[in-house]
């Protein structure tokens, strides 16, 4: 299969139609299976760590073997399934729409929409911190939902994108340092850290056309925390503070509703920039290895 055609059609699907229905969405099923295993196998201590590692292995293996199925099919079924699977590994339109819904003057409605895209307790957040949380989610998920899966598609094809999405899903479900997931979630969380190390920093580089201030803010981010990097870059571009109380704070003025709109405009430009780079590199790769 031609990877340029595959990627192009998957992008058209994403931009025109958005996400597949939840009932047939591979990532949703990864989550359901992982949740089922979590309820039965989660333990504390070393046993919990091993159980979490085993669940990770199962879900990653499922994603990997699922991504191989198109190669055993004939045209056009091979393309149809591959496009569907690749599309499920990234979410450009869906991320934009979820964050756009947080733009509202009704603070209770804002709490409701922000709660759908962040894990923190929105009940204790004031208006500025709700705006900050929405922008932070957009910046972090630009890496998780766009840059990283397509980065691994570039390197390893469909299996790379699907395996990354599986690991990232497990991290989103179990990657918490609390009593429940301190041990069970440690393995998928560390694996997600490894897989996101390069993409998170690549995401920061995509912001450089907006100014070198991005590099100054990059230095303020915690070295070991990948998600800080894109958030720091977005803070620099918008000139607003972004804060997760007790974790990080990047300087600037107070974020407002209009700044969420500005962040969405930045998001569109960065995505367009990244997709242009991906297509150019893929063309070069195909020319060098026809």
From Swiss-Prot:
Q: What cystine linkages occur within this chain?
A: none
One GO CC term of this entry? Answer: plasma membrane
Q: Where can this protein be found?
A: Cell membrane
Q: Which is one Pfam family of this protein?
A: CobD_Cbib
The keyword Disulfide bond belongs to this UniProt entry's keyword annotation? no
Q: How does it sit in the membrane?
A: Multi-pass membrane protein
| Primary location group | membrane
Mind telling me which residue stretches traverse the membrane in this protein?
Answer: 4-24, 49-69, 144-164, 269-289
Query: What GO molecular-function term can you cite, just one?
Result: ABC-type vitamin B12 transporter activity
Keyword check for Metal-binding, yes or no: no
GO:BP terms for this protein? cobalamin biosynthetic process
What UniProt keywords apply to this chain's record, in alphabetical order? Answer: Cell membrane, Cobalamin biosynthesis, Membrane, Transmembrane, Transmembrane helix
Look up the record and name the pathway of this protein: Cofactor biosynthesis; adenosylcobalamin biosynthesis
The family classification in the record reads: Belongs to the CobD/CbiB family.
Task of the protein: Converts cobyric acid to cobinamide by the addition of aminopropanol on the F carboxylic group.
Instruction: Kindly give the HAMAP family that the UniProt entry links to this protein.
Output: CobD_CbiB (MF_00024)
Q: Which PANTHER family match?
A: COBALAMIN BIOSYNTHESIS PROTEIN CBIB (PTHR34308:SF1)
Q: What is this protein called?
A: Probable cobalamin biosynthesis protein CobD
Gene giving rise to this polypeptide? cobD
């Amino acid at each position: 299969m031609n990877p340029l055609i595959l990627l192009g059609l998957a992008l058209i699907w994403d931009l025109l139609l958005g996400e597949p229905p939840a009932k047939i969405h591979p990532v949703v099923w990864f989550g359901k299976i992982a949740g089922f295993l979590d309820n039965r196998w989660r333990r504390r201590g070393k046993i919990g760590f091993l159980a979490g590692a085993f669940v990770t292995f199962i879900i990653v293996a499922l994603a990997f073997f699922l991504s191989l199925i198109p190669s055993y099919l004939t045209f056009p079924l091979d393309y149809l399934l591959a496009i569907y699977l690749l599309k499920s590994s990234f979410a450009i339109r869906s991320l934009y729409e979820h964050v756009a819904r947080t733009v509202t003057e009704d603070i209770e409605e804002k709490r409701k929409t922000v709660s759908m895209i962040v894990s923190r307790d929105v009940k204790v957040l004031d208006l500025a911190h709700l705006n900050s949380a929405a922008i932070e989610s957009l910046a972090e998920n630009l890496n998780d939902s766009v840059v990283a899966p397509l980065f691994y598609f570039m390197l390893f094809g469909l299996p790379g994108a699907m395996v990354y999405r599986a690991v990232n899903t497990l991290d989103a479900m179990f990657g918490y340092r609390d009593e429940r997931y301190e041990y069970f979630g440690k393995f998928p969380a560390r694996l997600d850290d490894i897989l996101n190390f390069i993409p998170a920093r690549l995401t920061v580089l995509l912001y450089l056309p907006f100014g070198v201030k991005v590099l100054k803010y990059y230095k303020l981010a915690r070295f070991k925390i990948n998600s800080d990097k894109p958030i720091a870059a977005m803070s620099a571009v918008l000139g607003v503070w972004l804060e997760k109380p007790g974790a990080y704070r990047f300087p600037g003025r107070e974020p407002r509703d209009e700044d969420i709109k500005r962040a969405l405009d930045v998001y569109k430009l960065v995505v367009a920039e990244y997709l242009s780079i991906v297509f150019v590199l893929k063309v070069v790769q195909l020319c060098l290895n026809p």
